[in-house]
Amino acid sequence: MKRILYLHAGAEMYGADKVLLELIKGLDSKEFEAHVILPNDGVLVEALRQVGAKVSVLDYPILRRKYFNPKGIADYIRSYNFYAKQIALYAREHSIDMVHNNTAAVLEGIYLKRKLKLPLIWHVHEIIVKPKAISDFINMLMGRYADKIVTVSPSGR
């Protein structure tokens, strides 16, 4: 059985949230075990549990505009380092086989790929154009670390 760890940017029930729910709902439970770590509690938590996912909530940082300044960058790096280690511990304890970043705003999968040598699937739901430096940085990270990149439309490519 393959254990997949999904990292997502929230726990609401909008587009990317619904895609994640449907994706996990469609997994063959004899072949795959879905683990999801979300940065906050919300309606998605129970919905995912209803379809058999093992869900944890851990307040890890999501790349947002509030981090796009010198103080924000320092805060993000500090928080990222702290929580990425906790997520890696979870991955080891649950014998995770693969990581699935379910948005461009979640970067913690990179840490798991580098430290635990796990394959990384990166699912892109958004088109980030501005600020261009951030767009270029995220695109570089995806190109460098993702084993596969999935987009929801040709526009995301």
Regions found by a protein language model. Give the residues of each.
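Alpha-helix capping/helix-boundary segments
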Residues: V43-L44, A105-V106, S155-R157
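Short N-terminal targeting/anchoring amphipathic segment
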Residues: I87-V106, I121
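A short, active-site helix/loop in glycosyltransferases that binds the activated sugar's phosphate group
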Residues: A146-R157
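Histidine-centered beta-alpha loop that forms part of the nucleotide-sugar donor binding/catalytic region
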Residues: A9, Y60, N102-A104, V124-I127
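An aromatic- and histidine-rich active-site surface loop
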Residues: M98-L116, P131, N139
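A short, glycine/small-residue-rich beta-strand->loop->alpha-helix junction that serves as a flexible
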Residues: L7-L21, I128-V129
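A conserved, positively charged/aromatic
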Residues: K71-G72, I121-D147
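N-terminal strand-loop element at the rim of the active site
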Residues: Y6-Y14, G26-I77
